[in-house]
Amino acid sequence: LQIAIRHPEIVDKIILGSALAKRNGVPDWFWDFMKQAKLENMPEQLKTAYKQVAPDTSGLQVMHDRDAKRMVNFKDISDEQIKFIKAPTLIIIGDKDVITPEHAIELHRQITNSELTIIPGGHGEYIGEITTIKPDTKESEFVVPIIEKFLDKKTE
């Protein structure tokens, strides 16, 4: 969102996966959770994946703390800034996502040239996020053709 707002000249298309533009786009418990975030509570799959690409584990704590602080200090993106986005935009969330359907619908209404897709599953499940993968996971099979169709569309 920020790149499309700040540098529209370099953005041809946007795919917003579980994007948050307003604090009220998630339930109140989310903000309490982020204030209490601790590395010990981070899913093991994410810690393992981090260590596979960055063996210096001290960076994991730094990344975690910065991400948590960034979320705690999150500021709403104004309606004017959102409405300024002109690039074709695909908005995707899961039907059990932490991002509320109402928030995704509001983004869709504010971004003139947008499409909205709500896929079965939780946060990130539709793209095979590592903590959601199960033997019978098929959600990414829904979203890949939707993304390909969106990206293949000719823009005016």
Language model features with spans:
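Active-site nucleophile elbow and catalytic-triad environment of alpha/beta-hydrolase enzymes
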Residues: 65-81, 95
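Helix-loop "lid/cap" segments that line or gate small-molecule binding pockets
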Residues: 35-41, 45-56, 66-73
